[in-house]
Amino acid sequence: MRERLERECEAFEQTLTDPGNQWRTELEIHDHVIDRCEYHDPEGDLIYSSSYGALVNGRAACEGYSKAVKLLLDRAGIENALISGVSENGEGSGGAHMWNIVNIGGDYYHLDCTWDDPVSDDGGKLRMYTYFNLSDEMISGTHRDFSYDFVCKSTAENYYIKTGTYFESYSRSSETR
């Protein structure tokens, strides 16, 4: 198993476009994990809670996604940590959840690849960046009861801010019909 996981990591590392750029490397790790993996959480099967489940088998629960991200970030030399708490879907339901904290450019951010990996109604994958480099304030609407030694207050490396693809304001009256 270890050799197979090592081969998967090495093959991915060969595809990195700019290994010296932390943000670009983090983005490519994010995309690789969500493109490679689909969410699967059967009770009692620990393989789905591992980086092997996510990167080799292509199926994992949140713990497997997070451990795969951690493994690839570690190998890229990017400081990061696993974090556990509770996530809620906005409808009052949720449960125990794991995601990552990552240090990009000297600031810490929340990174949740599991929540960025939705499946569309037709079964296709949609690539999203809603949970890519969030501050504590930004993530607190859906993630809570987490404790860690890092303060995530910057938004400079958030995907939408960094790429300039965000709304500063919105008005229904300005919608084009």
Model-assigned labels for residue ranges:
Residues 21, 50, 119, 134-136, ...:
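General structural signal for secondary-structure boundaries
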Residues 2-54:
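Secondary-structure boundary elements
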Residues 19, 42, 58-59, 135-137:
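Surface-exposed loop/turn and secondary-structure junction residues enriched for glycine/proline
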Residues 46-60, 64-71, 93:
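Conserved active-site-adjacent core of cysteine acyl-enzyme catalytic domains
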Residues 124-177:
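Low-complexity, Gly/Ser/Thr/Pro-rich intrinsically disordered linker/tail segments
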Residues 64-139:
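Hydrophobic/aromatic-rich core segments of domains that either
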